[in-house]
């Protein structure tokens, strides 16, 4: 049997574009496969600009702590392709084994009969095929891009549809206004299904989501609208809805935004029919959750050995303007607890708003090193990122690699060991985890 990598190489030749948002091709393929999308466990469908993966990670951790099996489909992967598909099992799921993935992809290739289809579409079909054949209690399904015409939007009646915070990203596909992006995300709302709307950073996004949820005949459940609320109190997470109030531990994932994501996850599970999950399982989920590359502290590994003694090394895949704002706020919160100089190591794609992203760190970062992202044709040259950073008011210089940037820190005199944040791209995150020898599991 061909490996999944060999199959992917062939799939790339089946469509001239990596992204082509429509449902016709995947609906045709799913019909030929016997409609696996109709044979799934209850589905919680998740869209949004920021926080989708973290919200799913919280849900999975809580479900597994409750003794339930949760299938998970997310994208993109960080290092290895099979990270996108997690097969649920009681006691904890695992990434789909290579032989199972290759078999499912081969079956999809055969059913597709050489017709045009994108890699994401055929991967989604393979994931749904696997999930339909392996029993589980729930499927946590992340939208790839947008929602309305995303390949995952083939579930007629999800147990719940969730939209996490919306911002401006992927304007070439979703539109260049928050309202346009919200309209695409709201396309996952379905008649008579709960529509969980997380706290939004933009009032216009919240208004569009609520209006379109009602227009779809969904049952909107909004944070802060007497449906549910979540806030930090004395370093703990307080969640309240129309039936319960939970005083919970601080989420293990770092950053104030993770309180919002955790609360959204709890609301989604309760709306989707998992309201009998007890406080102990919720607490265990918040304490044990993992989501690599999102404010992840690297305490061991090859790269962590390159930093000055006593330094902190952090990694985050934030890459859009709002992601940068969230990330800067998290770094500022850490800075309030200890006045440690912040060093940024940044790699960005050319499709992202580099100026908007970097401006969030003005007055916060002591120095920035711009680095290339290997094997990414769309990556901005490091020299260009450094120039943009300097133009917005950051002290910046280019480095040939993350390793070179880390090694050069020994030439800078800091009053105390610095806090180092590598950020700007999930592709960069994958490269860093690989170089550090700490792959996602």
What does each of the following model-derived ranges do?
Residues 72, 222-223, 297, 398-399:
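A structural preference for short, hydrophobic beta-strand core positions in alpha/beta folds
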Residues 1-50, 54-69, 79, 194-202:
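N-terminal leader/targeting and accessory segments in enzymes
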Residues 17-19, 23, 27-41, 65-156, ...:
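ATP-dependent carboxylate-amine ligase catalytic core
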Residues 425:
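Active-site-proximal loop/hinge segments that shape catalytic or ion-binding/gating pockets
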Residues 115, 135-143, 158-249, 262-284:
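Acidic, Mg2+-coordinating active-site environments of NTP-dependent enzymes
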């Amino acid at each position: 049997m061909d490996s999944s990598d060999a199959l992917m190489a062939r799939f790339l030749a089946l469509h001239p574009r990596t992204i082509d948002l429509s449902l016709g091709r995947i609906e045709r393929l799913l019909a030929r496969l016997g409609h696996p999308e109709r044979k799934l466990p209850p589905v919680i469908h998740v869209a949004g600009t920021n926080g989708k993966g973290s919200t799913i990670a919280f849900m999975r951790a809580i479900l597994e702590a409750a003794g339930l099996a949760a299938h998970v489909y997310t994208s993109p992967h960080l290092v290895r392709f099979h990270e996108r598909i997690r097969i649920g099992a009681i006691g904890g799921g695992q990434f789909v084994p290579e032989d199972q993935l290759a078999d499912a992809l081969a079956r999809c290739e055969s059913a597709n009969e050489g017709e045009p289809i994108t890699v994401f579409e055929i991967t989604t079909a393979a994931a749904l095929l696997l999930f339909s054949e392996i029993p589980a209690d729930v499927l946590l399904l992340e939208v790839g891009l947008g929602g309305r015409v995303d390949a995952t939007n083939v579930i007629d009646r999800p147990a719940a549809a969730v939209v996490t915070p919306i911002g401006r990203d992927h304007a070439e596909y979703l539109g260049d206004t928050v309202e346009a992006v919200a309209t695409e995300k709201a396309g996952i709302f379905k008649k008579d299904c709960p529509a969980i709307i997380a706290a939004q950073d933009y009032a216009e996004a919240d208004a569009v989501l609520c209006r379109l949820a009602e227009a779809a005949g969904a049952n909107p459940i909004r944070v802060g609208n007497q449906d549910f609320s979540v806030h930090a109190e004395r370093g703990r997470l307080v969640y309240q809805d129309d039936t319960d109030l939970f005083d919970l531990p601080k989420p293990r994932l770092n950053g104030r935004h993770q309180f919002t994501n955790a609360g959204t996850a709890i609301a989604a599970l309760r709306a989707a029919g998992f309201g009998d999950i007890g406080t102990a399982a919720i607490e265990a989920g918040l304490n044990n959750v993992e989501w690599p590359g999102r404010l992840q502290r690297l305490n061991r590994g090859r790269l962590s050995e390159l930093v000055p003694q006593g330094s902190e090394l952090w990694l985050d895949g934030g890459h859009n303007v709002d992601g940068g704002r969230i990330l800067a706020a998290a770094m500022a919160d850490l800075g309030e607890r200890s006045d440690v100089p912040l060093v940024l190591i940044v790699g960005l794609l050319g499709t992202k708003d580099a100026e908007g992203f970097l401006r969030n760190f003005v007055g916060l970062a002591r120095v920035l090193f711009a680095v290339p992202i290997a094997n990414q044709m769309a990556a901005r040259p490091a020299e260009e990122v450094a120039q943009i950073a300097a133009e917005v008011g950051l002290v910046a210089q280019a480095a040939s690699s993350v390793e070179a940037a880390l090694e050069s820190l020994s030439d800078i005199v800091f009053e105390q060991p610095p806090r180092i944040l590598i950020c700007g791209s999930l592709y960069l995150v994958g490269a860093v985890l690989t170089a550090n020898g700490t792959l996602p599991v």
